[in-house]
Each structure stands twice: as structure tokens, then as C-alpha cells.
Amino acid sequence: MKEKQFWNRILEFAQERLTRSMYDFYAIQAEVIKVEENVATIFLPRSEMEMVWEKQLKDIIVVAGFEIYDAEITPHYIFTKPQDTTSSQVEEATNLTLYDYSPKLVSIPYSDTGLKEKYTFDNFIQGDGNVWAVSAALAVSEDLALTYNPLFIYGGPGLGKTHLLNAIGNEILKNIPNARVKYIPAESFINDFLDHLRLGEMEKFKKTYRSLDLLLIDDIQSLSGKKVATQEEFFNTFNALHDKQKQIVLTSDRSPKHLEGLEERLVTRFSWGLTQTITPPDFETRIAILQSKTEHLGYNFQSDTLEYLAGQFDSNVRDLEGAINDITLIARVKKIKDITIDIAAEAIRARKQDVSQMLVIPIDKIQTEVGNFYGVSIKEMKGSRRLQNIVLARQVAMYLSRELTDNSLPKIGKEFGGKDHTTVIHAHAKIKSLIDQDDNLRLEIESIKKKIK
């Protein structure tokens, strides 16, 4: 009886936090198997769901556990139901029919797919800023056109959108070699259309794009402001594929509703499926990225050096890659194998322009800037008052303290009047969820971050 109450409470919390489509995908499909010795065994039908539950929903398990069991419940995830083979048999049968393409078409040579083989899910570093987008991309790569169609991923430059598009295409071809897949930047699609139009070969163009099983378009914002004929052709291509239940995945530097210069009917179609954002990597993710990028270079990057670098570049992955290139160049010239903080600081001096500004951001500076923005005092932020504007400021400050510093959760909680670390976890998850849904809040936080730095 308690297990049912416990699970229903979790679903209630999840419904408040998640969008409808995410709730249906991540929460409804999950199931609590048992709760014993303060461990909740939770069945997830897909292994990639674990990261979402662990990073985005774990705190609601803790809250529900205290409410129902008066104890801290730890989740344990399983991906096969005990003594239950029915679901796997159904899934296997589904896969057999899903990829039985009809009519049969000649597969596209890999060189013509536009894909880059080096970009896979295996070497994509997941973190809080991209977990939803990665999970959606994985879901699409398992169930073409049955999960989210189109899938629209947006975020700033250098955050991994192109990597994810290629990973989807490569994963599909690994499992379905005869699938017709095409990756192409929007600008190249436009040029291809204009070339075929000029040569009078529009039937060839239509056949190329409208016979695909998977179309991956990068930087769709490039279509904004283009001539009516160009947007009309993409509109018709989109409709032709969608009507045949073929998968479309798009990326952009902004959300569909902020794509100016596009016909409204296109914007509407971009929102038909699922829209996910990618935000800059947090401190832990930046360290993981640096570890992945440096482990095979033949140099010894000390752990404190990686932490130092992670603290200097927080806007995108390209900055981290550029810093690594700067460092390895100096190391090669000086014939150095051990990369210390001093070596790293020297190497990235030009990139940072002023090394004297490479300071750790104190939490009180974050509190000050957030307080100034929302008209809330630091005393109120550290207190326990629950007025809406104070709660928002407090949660935003906690969120930024975790994103912009390497302080531990208990340390952050202490700086906010001795709050428990679970409060920090909840605040971070709450703001992260709101950012994904509210562009105005996302812009507010970006504005605050610029003032902090």
C-alpha cells in the first residue's frame, strides 16, 4: 500500500515539474517494483532514462520518501522487469516491423549522407545542460518517427548540437544499414535547392530529399529571411516526409517561437513534436569534457589543472577545446609532459586576454548580483521567507552558485543561511526545469551571469 502511495506522490511531483511530453515519456513508462531497506527499485524501459531520473528527478524521490516512509529513500534502477519477458518480446517484435522499409530503396553511400563518423553517442559527454536533449535524441534513434517528430534542439554555438545530429544518424545506420539518412546544414540545403532550380532539375532535388528516412538539418535559423520560394520548398519537403512518417531533426541557435523571418506555418510545424534546449555545461560536465578530450593526447593533465581550466571557460565546448590546443602547443614546443596550472595559465593567457581576471567567483558576488536584479537583499535570500520574489531570487542564486563555482552542495547551502544540501539540489533542478520552458527566465539568468563575470 505504501509503495503505491510513494509512487503516486512521485508522479504528482513529476507532473508539476515536467512538460506533458516529457512526463509521458519519462514518468508514465517507469514503475516502482519494490521499496525495501530504504531502497526503491524502479523499472525504466530504456537505459538512457536513468540519467534523467538521477539528475532531474532524484530529489522528488527523496521528498516522497520522507513523506511516505519518513526515511531517505535511495533509488536503484533496473531495465528488465523481474520474471517478465513480455515487454522485451513486444519490443523485439516492434523493432522487426519498424525498420521494414517499404518500398525498398537503395541505401545512400555513407560519403553522401553528410555525416561525420567521429560524432557518436558514446563520445558525447552528458550533463545537466544537455540531458533532456540527449535523451530525446536517443529515443529518436531507437524509434524513428514514433517518438518525437520533429525533434527540435536549440542552444548557443559550441554546445554539441551538431554532434547530436550526427550521433543520431550514425546510430541509425549502425542498426539499420539500409536507412536513407541525410545530414546537411540549412545553408547548404538552400544552396542545393537554388542550384537544382537554376539547372532545371527540381524533380531530382525532390526525389533526393523526399525519399529519406531521416533528415537532419543543422542551423535551421539560416532559413530565416530567405525568399518565399526557398521557404516554400522546405515547407513542402517537411510535409512530404512528415506525412510519410519519416523522421526530421532540426537544430537552431534559438527556440522556434524566436525564429524571425520565417513563415508562421513553418514555425508551427517545428513545434509539432518535441523542443529541447542545450545550455552551457556546468562545472562537473566541463571537467568530464576536459578529461575526455585530454586522455589520449600523451600529456599528464593534473586533476587540479583540469579543475582550473573548467573554472575559466564556461560558455561552450569549443572554448575548452581551444584551450587544450593552446596548452598542447606550448607543451610540445617546451617538451613538457606534465601540465600544471602554471603551464595552463601561460598557454591560455591570450585566449583569456587578461590572466589577472581569472578569479574564482565568490558566492556572495552571485548573491549580490541576483539580489540587485530581483530587488531582494542578501539577508532575505539567506532567510526562510517564502514570498514569491524572494524564493525565485534564492533559487536562481543557488542555481548559479552550482553552475559557476566548484563549491560543494553543503558549502553552497551554508552560504544561504545554513540550508540543507537537498534544498540546493531542489533549487538547481527547479530553475533548470524552468529555463527549459521559459525563455524570459533564461535571458534574465544570462544577463545576471554577464554582470557576475
Curated annotation (Swiss-Prot):
Pfam families: Bac_DnaA (PF00308), Bac_DnaA_C (PF08299)
GO MF term list: ATP binding; ATP hydrolysis activity; DNA replication origin binding; lipid binding
Gene Ontology BP terms: DNA replication initiation; regulation of DNA replication
Region (Domain I, interacts with DnaA modulators): 1-74
Localisation per UniProt entry: Cytoplasm
UniProt binding sites for ATP: G158, G160, K161, T162
SUPFAM superfamilies in the record: P-loop containing nucleoside triphosphate hydrolases, TrpR-like
Matches recorded under InterPro entries: AAA+_ATPase, Chromosome_initiator_DnaA, Chromosome_initiator_DnaA-like, Chromosome_initiator_DnaA_CS, DnaA_C, DnaA_dom, P-loop_NTPase, Trp_repressor/repl_initiator
Keywords, in A-Z order: ATP-binding, Cytoplasm, DNA replication, DNA-binding, Lipid-binding, Nucleotide-binding
Region Domain III, AAA+ region, annotated ranges: 114-331
Stretches that traverse the bilayer: none
PROSITE patterns from the UniProt entry: DNAA (PS01008)
UniProt record similarity statement: Belongs to the DnaA family.
Quaternary assembly: Oligomerizes as a right-handed, spiral filament on DNA at oriC.
Free-text note regarding domains: Domain I is involved in oligomerization and binding regulators, domain II is flexibile and of varying length in different bacteria, domain III forms the AAA+ region, while domain IV binds dsDNA.
HAMAP family reported in the protein's UniProt record: DnaA_bact
Protein name listed in UniProt: Chromosomal replication initiator protein DnaA
Organism expressing this protein natively: Streptococcus pneumoniae (strain P1031)
Gene that this polypeptide is encoded by: dnaA
